[in-house]
A protein has these predicted regions:
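N-terminal segment of the mature soluble domain
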Residues: 1-36, 99, 103, 180-181, ...
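Acidic helix-start/capping segments at beta-turn-to-alpha-helix junctions
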Residues: 31-46, 119-126
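Amphipathic beta-strand/beta-sheet edge segments enriched in Tyr/Trp
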Residues: 43-84
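C-terminal/domain-edge helix-coil "capping" segments
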Residues: 69, 76-216, 229
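Hydrophobic H-region at the start of alpha-helical membrane spans
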Residues: 218-221
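Short hydrophobic membrane-inserting alpha-helices and related fusion/pore-forming segments
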Residues: 223-229
């Protein structure tokens, strides 16, 4: 459906802004596919979204292949989440994004400063190996579980490292441009998407009320028949 396609672009951008506003992360981008140029990749699947309930499955893996997060989230959205008096910038699904952000931060805090430095080095070398495999051969090893480990760092004056870093910076610039597109789309659909969620929430509640009342009537009828017998 068109709404789900729009959500698939809107929700990652809302999570991006949530992570950035927390102040615990550096650059956060929305990208169409995984990239070896980054330290951590977060992926998601929308399982349910009707304005009243939202359910997603989130996975997060760092450049070493280590899993940070792999779990489902289901949240019931209260009516006050759609209030015009809520805090500016707060999405009706904000509680969901906050839960994901908190879990990612908890996973990061389990790593030492040395482990985080190694993670950044592995991300850089994996990207370099993708560009020029022979120049970065032997710097990393991958175990049977698929985890990358740092064997050694290249020489500080290695010209291939400088070239790789220059290429990566150009890729970052392209991703920045792509995120301007996502930002424009985000602000363009923000109001109609919220209106749809609010209306959908009310319809879901009405439908559930009708089902409940129909069940009560049916049960009462069955009891009446039993009593008559």
């Amino acid at each position: 459906p068109e709404v789900r396609q729009a959500e698939a672009r809107y929700m990652p951008y809302q999570l991006k802004t949530t992570l950035e506003s927390s102040g615990y992360w550096g650059s956060v981008w929305v990208v169409p596919q995984r990239s070896d140029a980054v330290d951590l990749t977060v992926t998601g699947r929308i399982d349910l979204s009707n304005g009243l309930d939202v359910g997603v499955h989130i996975g997060a893996w760092d450049a070493t292949g280590r899993e940070w997060l792999n779990k489902g989230y289901t949240v019931r959205i209260p009516e006050k989440a759609y209030s015009q008096y809520r805090e500016p910038g707060q999405d009706p699904y904000q509680v969901l994004y906050n839960q994901i952000a908190n879990d990612l931060l908890a996973a990061r805090r389990k790593l030492s400063a040395a482990e985080l430095r190694t993670l950044r080095n592995v991300a850089e070398l994996r990207y370099g190996a993708q560009l020029v495999p022979e120049a970065f051969a032997g710097l990393l090893e991958q175990d049977r579980a698929g985890i990358y480990r740092l064997r050694r760092l290249p020489a500080e004056d290695d010209p291939m490292v400088s070239r790789m870093q220059a290429v990566r910076e150009r890729e970052y610039a392209l991703v920045d441009t792509l995120n301007e597109y996502y930002a424009n789309l985000y602000y363009e659909i923000n109001k109609p998407y919220e209106d749809w969620r609010k209306m959908s929430r009310e319809e879901v509640i009405r439908y559930q009320d009708l089902k409940r009342s129909a069940y009560v009537r049916g049960t009462a009828g069955a009891l009446a028949i039993l009593a008559a017998i």
